[in-house]
């Protein structure tokens, strides 16, 4: 039985917990072998075909010859799963500053104080963790938390995990320096990162954070926005199922889930370039700057001669190496990005998951509201209002919230995350 974990996160959670109990780790794709009653007796992530066949044959033999053993093991796993979801209420007292500092000290042991983020690979952006670190700094005045937050936000936005041409963050970095991403780009990641960078701008007044938040919104609108037969106007719902928008000329009122990592049979093909391609796309002056700005290498800075466009140097270092003034640098860099984007537009695009998920759209609703507030942009509040109206009219049916909308059909009762995210977005 194949289950879409985005449609049924409740089922995914049960078998992911089982996988972590059995193996000590989790991930996707998630595969589980269960008894007829649904209790898991084996779980893991990716298996090569031959290994998967061997596992199935071995477990089938155990179930045929020693069924009691299989049922006993499944029962023990079920007991542990039940214990994971059992919460004991405790009376807690007031939270003191010393406790907050102790919690951050524990967290700090698992942080990378050179590259930002967690001290391991792969590296996920983890916006909720950075929100906590910002709150910790504001509550306690802890300067180390402030320094780490700045470090992480800058390193992430300059790394290959961030798409400097089209905006938007990829799912995670495969290395510990934010360089080589898994190129999938998802709505719920970018929504939370928009909120984070917009809030960080209001806190610090750092122009980079405003730029990143705006570029991520631009990405969501251009790449993930859906349109229907009729744009949302005057509180009326879109008619029919959403379809993908091409460009900026449509009013979006709902958003798809993700862009795939692959195109043309290669992960990242849409986003990476050979040196020869860039020499063809750009003028000599533009290429000279791009080579410094994005660390372009003759044989590629990544795999198979391709370059990931990352930005290891600070702007002042780029100015020093290029010999340009700030007045020359900014328009030239803008021209470079525009030309690369036009070239990308001629490529085969990654496939687009166009299902609209309630909780993910609600996170983007919150992101637009945060951007409207922290960046002082009324255009974002108008987009947020349109999205909220669409969600009410589409996801709220017969006094319950539904989770998935695709091809004109809204289905699957909402989960706690759908209600919680929608309430927060509103």
Predicted stretch roles:
Residues 356-362, 366-426:
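Long, K/E/R/D-enriched contiguous segments that form extended
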